[in-house]
């Protein structure tokens, strides 16, 4: 099943699992304390027994979204405009902030912090994924609550596919969408 080894000042949990193709693999995770390692060992053993173990994956949010968009667009027959807007949203509003994060490491709190950051982000901060130099006047115009709500809708759908693809157990997107200001 799983075992704990002391390695210098840290503890490693070692375990065997099968990847998506059924090939046997070895995994290990390192923790600062023995208590953390024991907790993870118990979790890994339970997940291996009941078949809910997630194969460790280094896929980033950016990689996942760029795999998801073509599938989603062909499945739901998106118009070229919808496709272009979705890619632009990923490029300019998501990737610069959480794109390099691993999908498996993202938590609801991280997404909520991301929404808070977006609410303080000037419009046009990124164009084609490249940060722009904005004038003081341009910096006054922040992203609208509607734009942040659209980001939430895209992420909620994308992360539900990540659950279906066995990348994560549950979606990190908050249950409640950011409110749209009607002022």
Outline where the language-model segments fall.
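Short, Arg/Lys-rich segments that mark the N-terminal edge of DNA/RNA- and chromatin-recognition modules
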Residues: 1-30
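Conserved beta-strand positions that form and line the central face of beta-propeller blades
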Residues: 3, 28-30, 102-105, 172-175
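Conserved tyrosine-mediated DNA breakage-rejoining catalytic core shared by Y-recombinases
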Residues: 7, 12-14, 175-183
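Basic, Lys/Arg-rich DNA-contacting stretches centered on the C-terminal catalytic core
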Residues: 16-24, 136-140, 180-183
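DNA breakage-rejoining catalytic core of tyrosine-based enzymes
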Residues: 27, 104, 167-170, 179-183
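N-terminal helical hairpins
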Residues: 28-58, 71-76, 92-93
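Short amphipathic alpha-helical interaction/hinge segments
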Residues: 49-52, 122, 126, 163-170
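Short, Lys/Arg-enriched alpha-helical recognition elements, typified by the DNA-recognition helix
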Residues: 57-163, 175-177
């Amino acid at each position: 099943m799983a075992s704990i080894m002391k390695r210098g000042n840290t503890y490693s949990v070692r375990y065997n699992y099968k990847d998506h193709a059924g090939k046997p693999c070895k995994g290990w995770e390192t923790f600062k304390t023995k208590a953390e390692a024991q907790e993870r060992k118990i979790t890994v053993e339970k997940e291996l027994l009941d078949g809910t173990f997630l194969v460790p994956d280094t896929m980033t949010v950016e990689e996942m979204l760029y795999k998801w968009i073509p599938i989603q667009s062909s499945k739901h027959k998106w118009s070229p405009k919808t496709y272009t807007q979705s890619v632009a949203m990923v490029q300019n509003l998501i990737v610069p902030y959480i794109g390099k994060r691993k999908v498996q490491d993202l938590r609801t709190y991280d997404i909520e912090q991301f929404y808070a950051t977006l609410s303080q982000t000037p419009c046009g901060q990124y164009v084609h994924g490249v940060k722009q130099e904005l004038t003081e006047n341009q910096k006054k115009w922040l992203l609208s609550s509607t734009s942040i709500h659209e980001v939430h809708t895209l992420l909620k759908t994308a992360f539900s596919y990540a659950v279906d693809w066995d990348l994560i157990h549950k979606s990190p997107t908050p249950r409640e969408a950011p409110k749209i200001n009607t002022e």
